[in-house]
Amino acid sequence: VILFNVKESEQQEKEPEEVQAEVTQNPETMTQTAESIEDKYKVFDTMSEDWGSDDLEGFVFYDLPEQYADKGYFPEKMQIYTRCLCKQYDVPYALVLAIIEQESGYEFDKTGDGGQSKGYMQIYEKWHTDRMQNLGCTDLMNPYQNVRVGIDFLSYLLKKYGTIQDTLAAYNYGEKGAREYLWSNGVYVYSYNTAIIQRMKEIEEVVGK
């Protein structure tokens, strides 16, 4: 910790009221902030909304849990798109929501592991270049492309391993990692897949299967 000694006469710290007054009196700053926020969410306008209307009978929109409402964002158009993909791939919708909650807290622009894992489903591009190419996806920070790649991967894992438990282990560790660090040591149930399966069941009570 570096400490600086500042003479009392040189201190420029302002009282909270002064700072608030400056912010309030600076409409240009407020406009720039509003524009930057608006720009951030423009990515959700990159997808047509004329798909999936025939598949939404009984669909229930999901309200984010309170602890994720501040930073998380999962608008209705994103929910519809995700639900349609899940039906197309035969992947449980509640499972995808539980994974998104665990991985990113519904933050579509979240990055982790030094920027390597990206988006809602925290996908590593280096492990999914072929999958992305096959799906025509080029940007994992685009929420629509992110969930498409993630759901496609989940579909592959579910078909290969047969259980949600093992699918989640392979999703979390990678297939090779799950074999080497979990299954070869007799570990099939652990904190990650247990937590997500529990949340999946809770979410199913709200949105259905």
Task: Give the location of each predicted region.
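N-terminal export signals and maturation junctions of secreted/periplasmic proteins
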Residues: 3-81
